[in-house]
Amino acid sequence: MTYRSYETIQFGDLTSNSDRLGMLIAWLVNHQLTDANFEKENAKAISRLRLEDMTGPEFFTTVLHGEFGSAFLNHLGQDFVEEYFLGGTYDYDYNQVKSGVADERLLSNHVSQRISKAYRKYVEPPSLAKKLARVLRFR
């Protein structure tokens, strides 16, 4: 797979995206959807992130230098991001949670739950009932 840039950091009160992207990036790192070489090269920072000694936005701005792209992800991570993030579902989930939560830690927890739910749905093979429903729907 070739390198693909998903989004670059933006600054400003209304346009800042570091919190939104940092939460997704932290979830991806914490769920081992990162490239093995990236893990080795950034072991200390990844450990800090996993121990919550570094936030997702800090990791995004310092380790990834504000560039959210495919280079640090493994194939499964890239595929998931391209469906969930580029498909717009992550932004929808993030905005739904953000509108009802003011506390940053609580927001991160709720967003993480949404990402986990989407990921489980992504990796879970469709059941026979779902396959049959899809076939019958096209008739």
Regions found by a protein language model. Name each.
Residues 40, 44, 98, 117, ...:
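Context-gated lysine
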Residues 51-121:
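Amphipathic protein-protein interaction modules
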Residues 131-138:
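Short hydrophobic short-linear motifs embedded
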